[in-house]
Amino acid sequence: MDKIQTFFENHHCTKPVCDDQCIDNFGEMLKYNMNDISSIECGTRGKHENENWHRARKGLLTASRFKEVLHSRDQDVMAQRLLTPSTLDEDKLPAAIQFGRNYENKARLMFIKSHRYHHRKCSYFVPGLMVSKSNVFLGASPDGVVKCSICGEFLVEIKCFFSQKNFHPKNALIVSKVCEKVDDNTLHMIPSHKYFYQIQGQLAVSGLEKCILVAYTQKGIYTVDMTFDKDFWDESERRLSNFYRKYMYSALKNIEETKINTDL
């Protein structure tokens, strides 16, 4: 966010609406090299418990909001909403969020134990914020990165189902309409679900090809494999970039210029 503030402090466009050149300059300013991207990821580990993570996400479109952005009816309002600081009271979190906070690590440990039983040579770490190498407006914070001697490198995304906490996790995925059964009785994620958008975004940002969704309830865990869908992502990325250029940039510009004028 510091780069964004600096850009607008030195940006003296007199046009009511900035043209493509202004926005291109903004994008060039935001670009990170590989060392920057690695430093951001390392420096934001701990996610919501790390203030650096909150700061680094400001001004980005992050994977958990991709479906919301792509299907918003009023995109000006959507841009404002994305830039509005969270009003969540950490001492009075909604029950579903608190359930996720309470059990995410348990689900992670259950998955690691299960995976290592079959694939002993593997490592797991929880990344911070990943920034896209190819599109500086996009970021993601997956729940894990696994490096396995058999499976290669892949992401993990953990979902703890509060409303279905007493269901078997496979049934929780079906009842919540995250997944559907296919002919061989396995589950596939439904492409219209927000988790599908989120995971495809995480894969695109990370550059990896596979993610394992880990569903947790108090009956255990169930996993669903997902692979990168290039056609889906190419269209989504095009629309996300258009949203950023048309709506997010203007909203950022208004916020930063208001701050500058207030400080004068």
Where are these regions (language model features)?
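Nucleic-acid nuclease catalytic cores
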Residues: 115-140, 148-250, 256
